[in-house]
UniProtKB/Swiss-Prot annotation:
It holds the Pfam family PrmA. Methylates ribosomal protein L11. The gene is prmA. This is Ribosomal protein L11 methyltransferase. It catalyses: L-lysyl-[protein] + 3 S-adenosyl-L-methionine = N(6),N(6),N(6)-trimethyl-L-lysyl-[protein] + 3 S-adenosyl-L-homocysteine + 3 H(+).
Amino acid sequence: METWQELKVTVKREGEELVSNLLIELGAQGVAIEDSMDYVGNVDRFGEIFPEVEQQEEIVVTAYYPDTVDVTVVEADLQARLAELTDFMDLGELKIGTTALAEEDWADNWKKYYEPARITHDLTIVPSWTDYEATAGEMIIKLDPGMAFGTGTHPTTKMSLFALEQVLRGGETVLDVGTGSGVLSIASSLLGAKEIFAYDLDDVAVRVAQENIELNPGMENIHVAAGDLLKGVEIEADVIVANILADILIHLIDDAYRLVKDEGYLIMSGIIKDKLDMVRQSAESAGFFLETHMVQGEWNTCVFKKTKDISGVIGG
């Protein structure tokens, strides 16, 4: 029987996406996230309240490797890669441990984290292996969480989806920067966007996004490509959405202002509370006005508008 190895990394919440992506680059066949924030204040679609869970600053990223991979080498490589980033991000006191799993344990451990989740009023994310019947008006996003890059249930993704519901009315051109799983592009298509252009610097993410898009019918209007933020992009957009780290977000703001049409929107998520002022000041200096600010725990999402009419805009 084939066996698998489970590598657990405990890290500050801000480092979730970074650590997950590094583990995938180092050969993980899947990544699961355990985050106490996912249980705070949540109610499932049947009205059952989740048990109270103490909110922690740290999350656990669990990566799965076949037994043909030497996880001690993976651990050493991961430590070295993360050590290079200590000036860029406070990851906290890293804790790394490994466990051997049988094939059936791998399957059970993997899938137990993921169930259909109603994320917004209209959008429900469903694991690709699940049979799910949508209710009237419910839009389904099929994802394969085994490909990592998020399951769509992280607070930053949830708020990005809420923001897309808020600004999309149909017929828009959308740029999805740092697409990861492709969930925001798929949602944009379901919400009526005419054309979506998705970019990611990571070739693995480009492949993952394309595979997730193919799980959902009618997504021919989504175009995925490798790209470094918005460098070299010449496509004018009604909406630009980026759910990435705040220190990276500020580097796309000038290009976003260049590409967003008048009265268009820039949605920025993935902003830890300590970085909020930095992001807001950068966006406002470029000429954007803050229209909506969402908060969940320590995470922030901002919807900025490119407009000359600032009446009704927050701070306008």
